[in-house]
Amino acid sequence: VTCWQKAVAIEKVGLYIPGGTAPLFSTVLMLAVPARIAGCKEIVLCTPPGKDGKVHPAILFAAETAGVSKIFKAGGIQAIAAMAYGTESVPKVYKIFGPGNQYVTAAKQLVSLKEVAIDMPAGPSEVEVIADESANPAFIAADFLSQAEHGVDSQAMLVTASESIVKPVMQAIREQLDRLPRKEITEK
């Protein structure tokens, strides 16, 4: 008896890239590059268009660079349903990847009961930094702000036994926050 393990790529995958206040081109890369490396034959991407009816150029560039097969201007639960069940234009996929709001997460969980596989139910962005007095306050602040700018439901926590690090971290957050283009969202 000979046993072996064989890795086989999922033939068709769907990537959901949320819209919102910033183009998430890094999410395109984080999802499409592994799909491409794994050998997926068809990579379908759904993302809502902007107010001008167009997909942000950074999303398009990242998708083309990473080898996405098809891009559709569809967002929210409609996009999840289209990829799960297929439409006249959107092909049915075998697994859906990507973040989204609570409605997208619920839609992904629902279709995963019978139709397709999903990556995981993604929740709000969160970060917890465990630091002592040797930590760089500017780095901690940058870690906090990089997650907090994702949305008003994001959370950032500092765990420390050193009171001496707290004030410098708060000061670094204030300084960096003033330079952020998404300050209004981040400070909520």
Language model features by range: what are they?
Residues 156-188:
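NAD(P)-dependent aldehyde/semialdehyde dehydrogenase
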Residues 67-155:
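Conserved NAD(P)+-binding/catalytic subdomain of aldehyde/semialdehyde dehydrogenases
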Residues 42-44, 128, 157:
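A structural signal for isolated positions on well-ordered beta-strands in alpha/beta enzyme cores
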